[in-house]
């Protein structure tokens, strides 16, 4: 499979080992994991950062290698159940932040053709993601604009 905005192929990475149950060294109560996930979300962490925190720091000193194996639910599902989810999906939010940084860079450096193309590609990805999420996680009327993104993220 090729990359979206280049002519190169993607590099394949290693697969996660298949497992049906969490390892025995990571025996943590499901409720404790869910409470920690909600607590981290309220501190401002994104779902991917929450997974990393639980993997590295754990709950009550015991690492949680995989939240879905331990609880049967993904981090985003836990956040939805507890009404702690973000207004925007994480991938869309990250792309919007990148587009804002690129737009500010272009305002300071109008002759930078390489980053002008990077901005065009990023905004193209944003529009594609907005179409994907519209009606499900975003309003039907949602459209991307730089000003709207800047207002939402600041």
Swiss-Prot record:
GO terms for biological process: translation. SMART domains: Ribosomal_S13_N, Ribosomal_S15. It comes from the Archaea. Transmembrane segments: none annotated. CDD domains: Ribosomal_S15p_S13e. PROSITE patterns: RIBOSOMAL_S15. Residues 1-32 are annotated as: Disordered. GO terms for molecular function: small ribosomal subunit rRNA binding; structural constituent of ribosome. The keyword Ribosomal protein applies. SUPFAM superfamilies: S15/NS1 RNA-binding domain. It holds the Pfam family Ribosomal_S15. Residues 21-32 have a biased composition (Acidic residues). Residues 1-10 have a biased composition (Basic residues). GO terms for cellular component: cytosolic small ribosomal subunit. The keyword Ribosomal protein applies. Keywords: Ribonucleoprotein, Ribosomal protein. Belongs to the universal ribosomal protein uS15 family. Part of the 30S ribosomal subunit. This is Small ribosomal subunit protein uS15. It comes from Natronomonas pharaonis (strain ATCC 35678 / DSM 2160 / CIP 103997 / JCM 8858 / NBRC 14720 / NCIMB 2260 / Gabara). The gene is rps15.
């Amino acid at each position: 499979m090729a990359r979206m905005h280049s002519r190169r192929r993607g590099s394949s990475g290693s697969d996660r080992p298949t497992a049906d149950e969490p390892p025995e060294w990571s025996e943590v109560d499901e409720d404790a994991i869910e409470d920690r996930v909600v607590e981290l979300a309220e501190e401002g962490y994104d779902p991917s950062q929450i997974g990393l925190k639980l993997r590295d720091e754990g709950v009550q000193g015991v690492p949680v290698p995989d939240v879905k194996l331990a609880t049967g639910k993904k981090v985003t599902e836990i956040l939805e159940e507890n009404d702690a989810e973000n207004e925007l999906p994480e991938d869309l939010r990250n792309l919007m932040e990148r587009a804002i940084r690129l737009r500010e860079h272009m305002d300071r450096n109008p002759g930078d053709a390489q980053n002008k193309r990077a901005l065009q590609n990023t905004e193209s990805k944003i529009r594609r993601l907005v179409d994907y999420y519209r009606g499900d996680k975003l309003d039907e009327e949602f459209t991307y604009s730089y000003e709207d993104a800047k207002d939402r993220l600041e």
